[in-house]
Amino acid sequence: MDIAFITTLFIIGFIGAFISGMIGIGGAVINYPMLLYIPSLVGVMSLTAHEVSGIGAIQVFFATLGGVWAYRKSGLINKTLIIYMGSSILLGSVLGSYFSHYISEKGINFIYGILAIIAVILMFIPKKGQKGQEHSEDKEVIFNKWLASSLAFIIGGVSGILGAGGAFILVPIMLSILNIPVRVTVASSLAITFLSSIGATVGKVITGQVLFVPALVLMITSLIASPIGASVGQKVNTKFLQWVLAQLIGATAIKIWLELL
């Protein structure tokens, strides 16, 4: 690993974290194609799908840790949601990340291709949820616990394979299917995604899929760029950026599908 490769990783990580912070979509779905294709395209180094997913798991872990820390005293992280969805997504992500070692590179790219299409669709679905409801720490949140656990387990399994946290799928499900209040969803999804990233990180490290120097570079860039993106996102109209990003992710999905077929 030379300076050119580290610099390339820093730029990729900064762009991914900045966009992630700006429009509120998980960094993994953005960084995966950039890490997979850009280093080899510019001739600095080629990363495998397993290595990319391992690096992503570490980045998501530290990114969500920062979010959970920020919300720790808000009273909006719902303990019941964490018990049911958090434990399920943790188990799913451990299993997914561990068994991803046995999945071929084409198999991992196939899964990303499916999730990329889902991500594009979810970007344009209006976020519902119980906007009009104020929520306090003592107020009970009503939801289907077994449905929530089952969906979280599935999301964890798939996210563990890709080294993602799964927030870009988790949030719409919590809002539209489980009908969780918006503020509780935002705070609790960070905690649930954090647990998912723990499982993914453990599985990836155990199976030797993590390159620690690139992971460290992306961790640093996410801590720097994500807050900047979030600040900018509050001041500008991000709809156009969402549209452009959807086109890029969609194009990546098409490229992956063409390589697989």
Curated annotation (Swiss-Prot):
Coiled coil: none
Residue spans crossing the bilayer: 10-30, 51-71, 80-100, 106-126, 151-171, 186-206, 210-230, 240-260
Compartments it resides in: Cell membrane
Pfam families assigned: TauE
Keyword field: Cell membrane, Membrane, Transmembrane, Transmembrane helix, Transport
A GO term from the CC aspect: plasma membrane
Record has Transferase as a keyword: no
Membrane topology: Multi-pass membrane protein
Family: Belongs to the 4-toluene sulfonate uptake permease (TSUP) (TC 2.A.102) family.
Record-given protein name: Probable membrane transporter protein YrkJ
